[in-house]
Amino acid sequence: MAQITTTDANEFSSSAEFIPMRGFSNCHLQTMLPRLFRRQVKFTPYWQRLELPDGDFVDLAWSENPAQAQHKPRLVVFHGLEGSLNSPYAHGLVEAAQKRGWLGVVMHFRGCSGEPNRMHRIYHSGETEDASWFLRWLQREFGHAPTAAVGYSLGGNMLACLLAKEGNDLPVDAAVIVSAPFMLEACSYHMEKGFSRVYQRYLLNLLKANAARKLAAYPGTLPINLAQLKSVRRIREFDDLITARIHGYADAIDYYRQCSAMPMLNRIAKPTLIIHAKDDPFMDHQVIPKPESLPPQVEYQLTEHGGHVGFIGGTLLHPQMWLESRIPDWLTTYLEAKSC
């Protein structure tokens, strides 16, 4: 059975425990605050375009030139829906890795680096092929070094699926999954209720803008036209018309059920830390796995507060991005022990 950890605001503070910023424990404030405190990328990224076997590409944002850092431990970040290096959690963690002497990299999903991808496909919560190919390319190109993968939200569900599918064959030493929607169908309904509809509208606008850019650059590469795209009102409708159809699923519900990581979690073989907040406004209790469903190598941490990929502690004058210490601290055992 997995190790289950809960944190409470009254407990003694350490990097393993999350205490929300005083007066700002509200889930929506926690979700939104990172964009206030982590507005700009504070390092100069080294960009690289990786051509894929099918003629498409993904863009990589490194903390430094990887050819000059082959010996360093590696931390790979998989972002969330319409995320990128500019997402506060992504560049914040890469910067934290850089400060520890590690090589950090964000693998942008297809079409998420600012330039539309070429092929008749996009990315989704269960699309593990690109991540798998990248991790193996990383090892082939730069040799063996301790490697960890971190997935946030959609990228977390994808990473969980990848870990489950490939088991010990996946070339990573450990993984961390944050705020992942392990039950996609339930989360899609939750996003249509109450204040969560604000997040749905925001994300849907990003999805539609990205799809419109793709249609303009590569006409005919999506199964709908611009007029149909403009009429989409819900993420589930977007997934029905585009995500499911372009990737061979019957509809959005079929896609959600086939790509939800929850039924696969018991197959994870690599050491993995999963972090959820009870008050995550993007999802409900159905994403919380049962302890008996998790293998011993999975540690599950459920916090009372934190919102969705928030977890802001400290004070307004001195905010603390808890994930930027919690994740590297947990991974140190796997990355630095083998790099000596």
Swiss-Prot record:
Catalytic class of the enzyme: hydrolase
Print the keywords alphabetically: Hydrolase, Serine esterase
From the UniProt record, which GO molecular function terms apply?
A: monoacylglycerol lipase activity; poly(3-hydroxybutyrate) depolymerase activity; short-chain carboxylesterase activity
A GO CC annotation given for this chain: plasma membrane
SUPFAM superfamilies, sorted: alpha/beta-Hydrolases
Location of the AB hydrolase-1 domain: 73-312
Please indicate which superkingdom the organism of origin belongs to: Bacteria
Extent of the signal sequence: none
| E.C. number | 3.1.1.-
**Entry's family note:** Belongs to the AB hydrolase superfamily. AB hydrolase 4 family.
NCBIfam families documented for this protein: PRK10985.1
**Designated name of the protein:** Putative esterase YheT
